[in-house]
Structures are given as C-alpha cells and as structure tokens.
Amino acid sequence: GGDYYDFPETSETHPGDFTVAIGDVSGHGIPAALMMATARAFLRQRSILPGTLVEIVSDVNQQMVRDFGETGGFMTLFYLTIDTKNKCLHWIRAGHDPAIFYDPQTDTFEELRGDGIALGVDMDAHFAQYQRTNLKRGQIILLGSDGP
C-alpha cells in the first residue's frame, strides 16, 4: 500500500522537462496507503508551481512533517527531472535507494546518489539537487522500490 511512483506535471513551469517521482511510505496496509495518497497530492500540487527541485521537495517535506510528524510516518523519495532541451538530469534523493544510470556505449553503470533524509522526519531538513550532463540517446535510468 505504501509504494509510490508518478510522473508529476511540470510542463508549465519547466517546458520540455519530464519528471519522475518514486518513493515508499513507512508502514503497511490502509494507513500506509492513505499516507502515500496524501504525499502524492502534496507532490503533484507543489510540482505545478514555480520553483527549483530543492524548493519543491523541501515544501513537500514541511507539509508532511506538519501532517504526519506525530505519527512517526515518513516517505522516501527519488525525484528526477530529465531536461530534454539541455540534455541533462537533475535529481534529489530523500532517503530512497539511488537510481542506476546505464550507458550502453561504455557498458558502465553509475549510481545516482545524493544526500537527503526521508520526507516527514525533520522540518528543517536540507535537500541538495544533483545533476548529470551530456545525456545521449540510448542511455537508461533505472528506478526501483521494494514493492510489487
């Protein structure tokens, strides 16, 4: 019930970008599903507004702390934007497993790492945006979760 993936709409604020969010909410069953649905709504609402990835994730984190702080619930998140115009990736990692970047030309794998704690834990958490430039056709990004 707590696994999450989505493609938040950002076309008005970042034309040409493609955004992917994947996460996992703590717990199981109906409580986890409700927390995931709420987190999804927060993220979708914030993603359509102007702002950097850091601002988006920070705002969602603060809202989750307000809503779930006393329950001990939290959500991991990997938030990735593909900038098709400039051929680069931007991402924030908030406690989620790193994504894997595969380049078939060099037959190499790279973990897209980054610092950041899960959402809903600390009102003052700091998140950092990371990037990878020079994207080429055929490269693959793998995102995963522990759910089915």
What are these regions (language model features)?
Residues 2-26, 30-32, 36-148:
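Conserved subregion of the PPM/PP2C metallophosphatase catalytic domain
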